[in-house]
Amino acid sequence: MIKLRLKRFGKKREASFRLVACNSTSRRDGRPLQELGFYNPRTKETRLDAEALRVRLSQGAQPTDAVRFLLEKGGLLEKTVRPAETIGKLKQAAAREAAVKQAAKDAAEAKAAAANESDDSGTDSTES
């Protein structure tokens, strides 16, 4: 399978990346099948070979997450929401709602218990 990934080059702590097409089993900085673009994260400079990228994508090449973000930013791919992210966000929202409901329920129970205790202590003192 062909992957579209970033190949690191440059000095220490001054990395730049080439967007390349390569076999999925090859090393990160191994020899690519084709160079398709350039990305510098410090200056946010991005150069993409749009035609070559369209050809590779039509052949079934799979972009990594970082490359997918660059392609979406460059207008070569439509912005997609991954199902796992959506499900995770829905679960988090449901958990938050459940926690709020539980907190409200606990507060109501504590208030009722405090009211019952004050009523009980008031009746005990009048009887004594």
From Swiss-Prot:
Pfam families, per the entry: Ribosomal_S16
SUPFAM superfamilies, per database record: Ribosomal protein S16
Bias (Acidic residues): 117-128
Region (Disordered): 107-128
The entry's keywords: Ribonucleoprotein, Ribosomal protein
InterPro entries: Ribosomal_bS16, Ribosomal_bS16_CS, Ribosomal_bS16_dom_sf
GO annotations of cellular component type: cytoplasm; small ribosomal subunit
GO process annotations (BP): translation
Domain of life: Bacteria
Molecular function GO labels: structural constituent of ribosome
PANTHER family recorded: 30S RIBOSOMAL PROTEIN S16, SMALL RIBOSOMAL SUBUNIT PROTEIN BS16M
UniProt record similarity statement: Belongs to the bacterial ribosomal protein bS16 family.
HAMAP family in UniProt: Ribosomal_bS16
Protein name per UniProt: Small ribosomal subunit protein bS16
Taxonomic classification: Bacteria, Bacillati, Cyanobacteriota, Cyanophyceae, Synechococcales
Gene label: rpsP
